A protein has these predicted regions:
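Buried hydrophobic packing segments
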Residues: 38, 72-77, 142-144
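Oxyanion-binding and handling regions
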Residues: 1-36, 85-168
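Short, low-complexity, polar/charged sequence segments that are solvent-exposed and flexible
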Residues: 18-21, 42-44, 73-76, 120-121
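DPxDG-like acidic metal-binding loop motif
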Residues: 53-58, 63-83
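Generic alpha-helical scaffold signal
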Residues: 28, 32-35, 48, 66-70
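Phosphate/pyrophosphate-binding loops at sites that engage ATP/ADP/AMP, CoA/4′-phosphopantetheine
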Residues: 38-53
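Long, contiguous secondary-structure blocks with strong helical propensity
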Residues: 2-8, 15-16, 52-55, 72-77
Length: 168
């Protein structure tokens, strides 16, 4: 499970037990490089063969974070010949948090995540961000639970058109 929408990357191993996703391992070393964090969770070739799929959060959220996590997920899925599933980050994370929260989208804006959906707001009016501590254990399971069927290509979700593209 990989998701970079929050501005820090969630890296976790999730198993299904009695029909429910359970986070069995999660790397909380957010200041470490992403590939190092991934290999910390699955260090040996034997452990890698126990993986059955790769799930990635597709945003909306941190522009760079979503793209980095998606790139890593595609590489892992291709390298290990595993199915790739995508999960709408805002919807899954709202289910995990059970409250409104915001995701920083640079220095001026945030993505306000509400039960009814997500919208871009000025950063100064945004609600509290979902913290790293709040996300532990629950975010990965929520993303896994909300994942769709296997896909050949990831479709990243953006909250608004890119700046300057309005007239095109």
């Amino acid at each position: 499970m990989l998701d970079g929408s929050l501005g820090f990357c969630i890296v976790a191993i999730v198993e299904e037990r009695d029909g429910l996703p359970v986070c069995v391992a999660e790397d909380h070393l957010y200041d470490r490089p992403l590939l190092q964090r991934i290999t910390n969770l699955i260090p040996s070739p034997v452990e890698r063969t126990m993986l059955t799929e790769v799930v990635v959060g597709t945003g909306p959220g941190s522009y760079s974070g979503v793209r980095i996590a998606a790139s890593a997920a595609v590489g892992i899925a291709a390298g290990l010949a595993l199915p790739l599933r995508e999960s709408a980050s805002d919807q899954a994370l709202w289910q995990a948090a059970q409250r409104s929260f915001s995701i920083p989208l640079g220095t001026r804006e945030s993505l306000e995540v509400l039960e009814s959906g997500a919208l871009v707001v000025p950063r100064e009016t945004a609600s509290l961000h979902l913290s790293q501590e709040e996300s532990r254990g629950v975010a990965a399971c929520a993303l896994a639970r909300a994942a769709g069927p296997a896909v050949a290509h990831i479709t990243l979700r953006y909250p608004a058109p890119a700046r300057g593209s309005e007239g095109q």
